């Protein structure tokens, strides 16, 4: 927010009026032409592909050793949440999604993102990784996830911390069953 306020000083519509900061810095207003300006928010889908009661976690090259997380990607212009989930799962791990179940959102203010958490039921468990995106992926059962939470994962796998959407999706999966649906 500090950076956004620092770079948005003048009105983009009438170009010669200074903007006034309101609502604790979350909005700017031009007193001359009444234009309101809000910070940009980039929507991101983050999802757990699910097949036969197991979820798929992926590992990017930039992750710390042995860390795995949910898959994620930005929504493209004109795309629905469901379309983005289908596209990202197909692009990153080569799986076909047959249903998407929205779970929750979380603002991620430090990079101006809105994280949209979903479960995605897939047709099978045969991955084809885009190695530019995902270095390795692993299917985990609820029992495997429980072992990770108590520090007894045989591969010493770990997941993002509790504040992260990926962590919350994994916890949600432990305590609920994704609803099977035909199609999207």
What are these regions (language model features)?
Residues 28-70, 74, 96-99, 120-122:
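N-terminal strand-loop-strand
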Residues 175-184:
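Single conserved hydrophobic/aromatic residue that forms the stacking wall/gate
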Residues 2-6, 39, 60-62, 76-81:
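Short, contiguous, pocket-lining structural segments
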